[in-house]
Amino acid sequence: FFKQRGLALGLTLVGTSISAMALPIITTWLINDFGWRVSYAALALLPLGIALPIGLLWFREPKPEERPPEIAAAGAVSLPGRSLQEAMREPRFWILWASIALVTIAYSGALVHLPSMLGARGFERSEAAAVMSVFGLSIFAGRIITGYLLDKFWAPIVTLPILCLPALSCWILLGDGPLAFVVAITAAFLMGFASGAETDLVAYLAGRYFGMKSYGQIYGVLYMAFGLSAAVSATLYGWVRDTIGSYDPILIAAAVMFIAGALLLLLLGPYPDFGRVTEEERGSTTAPNPSAK
């Protein structure tokens, strides 16, 4: 994708958002009627029964005639950009890595423990499931809206308010007193919106700041920050709750991490210009596409 890469990424990732909306309600029904063991087994069957067949039947490399003209014309010419080693020597690579890690630690554990937080505030299981469905809806909105804005404006400016707003969610969730349903929904929506935005952001910025030459490798290493931080975050939230008896300390730390992660992105600077593949470099008579990025 060249012209609207941000929106394309957002649309591609909406499947996880739909799952996040539907699965809390489905899981609650399964637990209530069949128990948690059956619920786990049913969830395990979903990727085998739905995702795997879809991938085997329809996920493939496009044929030459199906490719966009600018890609088909380029043939085997190397794409512009950095190699993984070159990217890792740039400070902005580690700035982006740190930003991803901070924001992921902040929201990933909150997502896992949000039903527990709501239960401690007097929410029934069905009410907590409804709030989690709103979380999924906001991920959907975050991916589409952020993807569209990334194509129009400088990414760090787009994401600064989006990643700072979940700090308000952390403040809302502090304490152990009664919590209004609409307030809980607001907290879940803001955090979910940021979650959707960040997923778009990693894929988008990997291409804009380091080019497409080694995009897969660079994106993979950047995504390690997401995967490792998500694993640490859920355990960290649980450890704080079990040790101190409250989620408040980790929620305060998460609010700081949201803001710090957003501010770090401002240090990335303008997008590099990797140049465009010329007609001579392509060895083709096809003129280069001036709108290709």
Predicted segments, located by residue:
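Multi-pass alpha-helical transporter architecture, strongest
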Residues: L52-W58, A255-G283
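Intracellular juxtamembrane helix-capping segments at the cytosolic ends
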Residues: F1, L9, A197-F210
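Extracytoplasmic gate region of multi-pass secondary transporters
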Residues: Q85-Y148, S233, Y237
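Flexible cytoplasmic inter-helical loops of multi-pass small-molecule transporters
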Residues: R60-R82, G275-S284
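A late C-terminal transmembrane helix in Major Facilitator Superfamily
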Residues: A20, Y209-I244
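Interfacial helix-cap and linker-helix signal at transmembrane-aqueous boundaries
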Residues: I25-F34, L118-G119, L149-L150, L236-G245
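C-terminal transmembrane helical hairpin of 12-TM major facilitator-type secondary transporters
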Residues: Y107, E127, S133-I139, I145-Y148, ...
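Helix-loop-helix hairpin linking two adjacent transmembrane segments in secondary transporters
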Residues: T16-K63
